[in-house]
Amino acid sequence: MSSSNGRGGAGGVGGSSEHPQYPKVVLVTGACRFLGGYLTARLAQNPLINRVIAVDAIAPSKDMLRRMGRAEFVRADIRNPFIAKVIRNGEVDTVVHAAAASYAPRSGGSAALKELNVMGAMQLFAACQKAPSVRRVVLKSTSEVYGSSPHDPVMFTEDSSSRRPFSQGFPKDSLDIEGYVRALGRRRPDIAVTILRLANMIGPAMDTTLSRYLAGPLVPTIFGRDARLQLLHEQDALGALERAAMAGKAGTFNIGADGILMLSQAIRRAGRIPVPVPGFGVWALDSLRRANHYTELNREQFAYLSYGRVMDTTRMRVELGYQPKWTTVEAFDDYFRGRGLTPIIDPHRVRSWEGRAVGLAQRWGSRNPIPWSGLR
């Protein structure tokens, strides 16, 4: 595993960070979720920080509350103007917004999800704008803002955009939220705004759509396609958020592990059985859902499982000064081992079968060549 880099220069989204200072009072939203809760615990253990305030609309579990240590928990919905009072009275100088959810509540669907994410962010950033003590805002965003398509570049840079505009859903909400926090940086140029676009996260403790998708004995795949996966270990996601909160580097940063893993390789490493399904529009999406007995997959996730997504992380290393400890392959292997998943079939045997199949196909092809004019 690689070790952490040195420090880098400042980015360019709102605020100046030529002489960054350590935060004294940090507020973390989404404190009852994995990232928010464990980030709160990390920051509370840092003696350079005087006070950590954890905020969520629901009460944390006893275990999470214990992990938070000296952090103060405030039960508050960030959609409520009360959040402004919490920031003002607490003299908060650094806000880490980690509360955005990628899945809808049990009732309400996408409309409820948009209400939670977008309206909450608007209220929170408005409160930050009015609070003279706030000097730093860190937003946990997502690589999903780039989308996935057959026309994607080899790697997305922070200046790239999706090849297909989003009309709704979590990627659209995430882009809107990024726009609101950039507007905050323009209105308050003394606030350093940091946006972290996290790659798809995976690990032994974090529960995500991708981790559940790969945990089943039968893993549906899109026939004829093999997605390129760039992952991010859950601990590296926490490390990046902590680094951003402490460093105060303004800018937008892609956060992802080194290397890629093809979906077919991931399935083999896990000893799972791939189940190809047809790739014809909505029917393919429905087939994927039925084959996996799983209804959470939406259009964007379907595209990701078809084409994948890879980001350029140069700015993360050079400017933010952060280097993930786990590579993509190491992150996947740690997830698989940590979950205690038992291979359905021996991965070595799968590779042996695959090698034989490729050999047979090559021999058959040499005896039965297909003229190029016949391909369309």
UniProtKB/Swiss-Prot annotation:
Family matches, as InterPro entries: Epimerase_deHydtase (IPR001509), Lipid_A_modif_metabolic_enz (IPR050177), NAD(P)-bd_dom_sf (IPR036291)
Pfam families in alphabetical order: Epimerase
One Gene Ontology CC term in the entry: plasma membrane
Gene3D superfamilies: NAD(P)-binding Rossmann-like Domain (3.40.50.720)
Protein name as catalogued: Uncharacterized protein Rv0501
Family: Belongs to the NAD(P)-dependent epimerase/dehydratase family.
